[in-house]
Swiss-Prot record:
Keywords of the record: Allergen, Disulfide bond, Hydroxylation, Secreted, Signal
Species assigned in the record: Actinidia deliciosa (Kiwi)
Signal peptide feature range: 1-24
Source organism, top-level taxon: Eukaryota
Name of the protein described by the UniProt record: Kiwellin
Amino acid sequence: MAQLALLLLSLFLTLISLAPPGASISSCNGPCRDLNDCDGQLICIKGKCNDDPQVGTHICRGTTPSPQPGGCKPSGTLTCRGKSYPTYDCSPPVTSSTPAKLTNNDFSEGGDDGGPSECDESYHNNNERIVALSTGWYNGGSRCGKMIRITASNGKSVSAKVVDECDSRHGCDKEHAGQPPCRNNIVDGSNAVWSALGLDKNVGVVDITWSMA
């Protein structure tokens, strides 16, 4: 019995001596029992080496994809004529110089949008300086009748009135004249808006910035 105990003790000491120094050091998400098992500034959290939230290190999270600008992510998809389009309930935050895409819209009866403008249930003359805003910016109609200031990359600016929503949630139907859902960063302007900015509406889409006037 004494010989067996001596043999087991000898085996245990041999195993310890064979373990190289630092063999237990783990990197991100490696196994650990305490912070001594983790490399550098990492600490042991729930049996895995990870960043120390109190220190604020980002060693393990450094490769995590950054969130989309403005934190606005697609809420779903719609398929129009075999092509999928993202839908949105939100738009990027409005600032004193909000980046956007200017598109052209026909606000007259039978025009691009199908139905009358959301704000007043009326059709409009395209000689008016008017716009439709993406769903998030339209904000349930809270910007109806308000003026926004649009600035083109050529330096020209124009004030235009919000009369409609560029629907980012729905599309591909009769109500939307078969068009896909609007992107979440659209200012859909009348011919008069494009003309005042010195832009060719046939270009289709141009980069602008806008703010509340």
